[in-house]
Amino acid sequence: DNLTKTPLRASHVIMIIMKRSKEVKIREVEEIAAVSCAVQNMYLTTTVYGIGAYWNTGGVTYMEPAKQAFNINEEDRLMGFFYLGKKKGTYLEGKRKPIEESVEWIDDYNTEL
């Protein structure tokens, strides 16, 4: 039931596909990371323009028939759907710790880990 109703909740849906590079041999994990960074940039852009956005990686994303239905090559990967539309309400204000609580700087390269 969610598979048929979820896409209707957004005015636009962008399919996120990682298309493997054939000319240059890049590790798959690096291509997945590159696509993820691109989606993050899309998300940041929608936030600036006040557009609601959501990246869904569930549902049909991991179903093999979906790759066939959308003509996705075997070596490529369906990485989800990016939903766009009018946002309901306002975004919650972020609560961040000072960076010093999350980062440890290493000044000496000879330091044993």
Residue ranges and their predicted role:
Residues 26, 30, 51-65:
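GST superfamily/GST-like fold recognition
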Residues 18, 57-58, 86:
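Short secondary-structure boundary segments
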Residues 41-42:
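Aromatic/hydrophobic pocket-lining residues that form π-stacking "cages" and hydrophobic walls in ligand
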